[in-house]
């Protein structure tokens, strides 16, 4: 060993093994207990020494600030898998993702990157010392029962371009730990210069490592560093827990900068619910809308079912209606007749609450006491119809619903039938012939009610042609009979 330490190597010679060589040759033999030629890599308890004291313990002289050591894994817990990486002056903190080392298509080990911090978490100060830990793959240990992962191979690197206080200190106020089950990234075994290896840092700005041959390699910046192994997990989780976290507020302020979010959170008025103005009334400053309603609308709201105030003041039943004597006009007026003298609900009167009353007469009303349905009453009905057509949409909807219920039509038909039967019984002269004539005339009227003038002309022409044909046929028959009589005589 002393010979290697005292040996002066010529320029260009050095110890620059690849990652695959460190695991497959040196670390695997160390775990198997096999002898390594020259024993270039010493065994040192790295976690009990400060990083600046380790270069003196290396047996191979080097000028590239890279030193290799075997270290026994000091478990933080007796039955755990976490290593205790704390020293007297500071601690080694893991950063970046674990990367798989492959030889061909087979994974032979894992590479972990750590950075030394002075002090104690979470106020540790980042330093220029970097360590790469090489682990043998677990499947290699399972394949060989005599193998144990009791050793790791460590490579210590010191960065010469490190400037303390130039944005290199770790921001401990917002740690972003790396989960332990993160999938490792793969490092290819084919590297142009195995000595020029990337260095993973926590800072957003890339860092470079100066090599002796002038080759500089850009650092790979890690987005999610993992917590130090010697940090209490419960304390670290308590620091991450925010009892005032609001997911809706966080989503709403996702697009805002930190300064804008601080202003939003400090503004108490911005958190209060926004009160929208109600523009439902015509005037924004007036709450009551009764001043903007017509008298008809107010009455329709209080007393739904009618739109004519004059008819309410002077009900229609005060003016009994006399039927017309002719059949053609009497049918229409008969259907419109609806007296309202008896408003008591009964089994035969189911619509007493809607203003329609069914009334049965046992005696014939004298003609002298029945005024004609014309004049003032007819004018009032016309005014009511006009008001119904020009009233508010709400009144029109009520009228349409009332008519669509079907009760008015049914009542009108029953009333017309009752009146006709009452008139026949009161007269004491049942006239079947008159009823049949009325039915025949009503059928003819209904058949030709929808005919237009052109259809009437066609009907008249067809009737005239039929009449002429009948007359001609009759004359022909008479002439034929007269000729036969002459022949017989």
UniProtKB/Swiss-Prot annotation:
Keywords recorded for this protein, A-Z: Activator, Cell membrane, DNA-binding, Membrane, Nucleus, Stress response, Transcription, Transcription regulation, Transmembrane, Transmembrane helix, Unfolded protein response
Domain spans labelled NAC: 9-159
Any single GO CC term annotated in Swiss-Prot or TrEMBL for this entry: plasma membrane
DNA-binding annotation, residue ranges on this chain: 108-165
UniProt cross-references to Pfam families, sorted A to Z: NAM (PF02365)
UniProt KW Iron-sulfur keyword: no
Transmembrane segments: 456-476
Region: Disordered, residue numbers: 413-435
Compositionally biased intervals (Basic and acidic residues): 413-427
Disruption of the gene: reported phenotype: No visible phenotype under normal growth conditions, but mutant plants exhibit hypersensitivity to heat stress.
Localization in the cell: Nucleus; Cell membrane
Topological relation to the membrane, as annotated: Single-pass membrane protein
Presence of keyword Disulfide bond: no
Tissues and organs where the protein is expressed, per its UniProt entry: Widely expressed.
Lineage top rank: taxon: Eukaryota
Gene Ontology molecular function: DNA binding
A single GO BP: regulation of DNA-templated transcription
Upregulation: Induced by salt stress. Induced by cold stress. Induced by dithiothreitol- and tunicamycin-induced endoplasmic reticulum (ER) stress response. Induced by heat shock.
Entry function: Transcription activator involved in heat and endoplasmic reticulum (ER) stress responses. Regulates the expression of genes involved in ER protein folding and heat stress-responsive genes. Binds directly to the promoter of BZIP74 and regulates its expression in response to heat stress.
Name of the protein in its database record: NAC domain-containing protein 74
Natural source organism: Oryza sativa subsp. japonica (Rice)
Name of the gene: NAC074
């Amino acid at each position: 060993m002393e010979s290697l330490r005292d040996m002066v190597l010529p320029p260009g010679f050095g110890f620059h093994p690849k990652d695959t060589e460190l695991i497959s040759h040196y670390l695997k033999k160390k775990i198997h207990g096999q002898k390594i030629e020259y024993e270039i890599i010493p065994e040192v308890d790295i976690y009990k020494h400060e990083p600046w004291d380790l270069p003196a313990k290396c047996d191979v002289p080097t000028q590239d600030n890279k030193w290799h050591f075997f270290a026994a894994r000091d478990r933080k817990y007796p039955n755990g898998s976490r290593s205790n990486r704390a020293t007297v002056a500071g601690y080694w903190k893991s950063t970046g993702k674990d990367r798989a080392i492959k030889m061909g298509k087979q994974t032979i080990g894992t590479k972990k990157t750590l950075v030394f911090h002075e002090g104690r978490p979470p106020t540790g100060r980042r330093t220029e010392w970097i360590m790469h830990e090489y682990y043998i793959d677990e499947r290699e240990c399972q394949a060989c029962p005599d193998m144990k992962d009791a050793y790791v191979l460590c490579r210590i690197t010191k960065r010469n371009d490190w400037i303390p206080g130039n944005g290199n200190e770790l921001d401990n106020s917002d740690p972003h730990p790396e989960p332990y089950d993160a999938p490792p990234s793969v490092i290819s075994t084919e590297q142009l210069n195995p000595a020029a290896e990337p260095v993973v840092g926590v800072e957003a700005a890339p860092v470079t490592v100066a090599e002796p041959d002038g080759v500089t390699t850009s650092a790979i910046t890690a987005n999610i560093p993992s917590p130090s192994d010697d940090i209490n997990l419960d304390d670290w989780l308590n620091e991450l827990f925010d009892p005032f976290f609001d997911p809706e507020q966080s989503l709403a302020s996702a697009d805002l900068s930190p300064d804008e979010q601080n202003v939003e959170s400090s503004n108490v008025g911005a958190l209060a619910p926004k009160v929208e103005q109600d523009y439902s009334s015509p005037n924004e400053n007036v709450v009551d809308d009764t001043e903007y309603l017509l008298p008809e609308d107010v009455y329709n709201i209080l007393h739904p079912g009618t739109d004519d105030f004059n008819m309410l003041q002077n009900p229609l039943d005060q003016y009994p209606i006399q039927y017309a004597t002719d059949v053609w006009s009497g049918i229409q007026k008969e259907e419109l007749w609806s007296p309202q003298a008896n408003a008591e609900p009964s089994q035969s009167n189911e619509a007493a609450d809607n203003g329609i009353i069914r009334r049965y007469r046992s005696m014939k009303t004298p003609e002298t006491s029945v005024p004609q349905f014309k004049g003032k009453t007819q004018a009032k009905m016309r005014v009511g119809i006009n008001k119904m057509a020009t009233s508010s949409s709400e009144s029109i909807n009520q009228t349409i619903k009332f008519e669509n219920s079907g009760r008015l039509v049914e009542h009108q038909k029953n009333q017309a039938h009752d009146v006709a039967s009452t008139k026949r019984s009161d007269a004491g002269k049942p006239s079947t012939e008159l009823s049949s004539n009325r039915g025949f005339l009503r059928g003819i009227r209904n058949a030709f009610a929808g005919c237009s003038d052109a259809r009437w002309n066609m009907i008249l022409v067809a009737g005239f042609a039929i009449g002429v044909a009948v007359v001609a046929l009759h004359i022909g028959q008479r002439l034929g009979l007269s000729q036969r009589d002459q022949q017989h005589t």
